[in-house]
Regions:
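Core RecA-like ATPase module of SF1/SF2 helicases and allied nucleic-acid translocases
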Residues: 1-199
């Protein structure tokens, strides 16, 4: 990425990312801001905005959540910061597989370069505990957890660079047809191990 694209920043406009853990939070935030930003000049105007929003799946072009494997193009990166020992950035993302749907969200940068597929269970637990400590002033555990479910950093999207996608990660959803040229193969070469690898 650094050599071919000449990008020195960890994340910049034009980068391709892949969501590596399902996320339900940010689309809900997007829907709420769309509804809250509806003009209040008249009930008819607000109703019209609501109808437009509902026509295409609550204003999200039919996306119900950000799924593991969804690709996004970074439009802008702002407010890179370190909190709780993790690095976060506010980003504007465009999802080409969903009619170029755009979303403003927070991503956790630590997942970009890890060897693991996403943040490890230990990292997730550490982040959870750090966020929980921030809400320690709320005495009732149920209320504290309710507040935490709305925390933007705890719900930051976990992403990886998406310059190369394995067939497994794409889950067949990226292409209508896939053609494999395996070259010249003799019957001896078509072993169960090879077929398993091919799959």
């Amino acid at each position: 990425r650094n050599t071919i694209l000449d990008r020195e920043e960890e994340l910049s406009s034009g980068d391709w990312l892949m969501v590596v853990r399902n996320n339900y939070f940010w689309l809900q935030q997007s829907i709420e801001s769309l509804v809250n930003d509806a003009p209040l000049a008249s009930d008819a105007a607000a109703s019209s905005t609501m109808q437009e929003t509902e026509k295409d799946g609550n204003g999200t072009n039919g996306i119900s959540f950000l799924a593991n494997g969804d690709r996004a193009l970074v439009q802008r990166v702002r407010n890179v910061r370190e909190v709780y020992g993790f690095r976060f950035a506010d980003v504007w993302l465009q999802f080409p597989d969903y009619d170029r749907y755009e979303l403003q969200a927070t991503v956790v940068l630590d997942s970009l370069n890890t060897e693991a597929p996403a943040l490890t269970p230990a990292q997730n637990e550490r982040l959870f505990q750090e966020v929980m400590a921030d809400y320690a002033d709320i005495p009732l555990k149920q209320e504290r957890l309710k507040k935490m479910r709305q925390d933007k950093l705890l719900n930051a999207i976990q992403v990886k660079y998406a310059y190369a996608i394995t067939c497994h990660k794409a889950q067949g959803g990226q292409w209508a047809h896939v053609y494999l040229d395996q070259g010249y193969m003799t019957d001896d070469m078509l072993t169960p191990d090879y077929v398993h690898w091919l799959y």
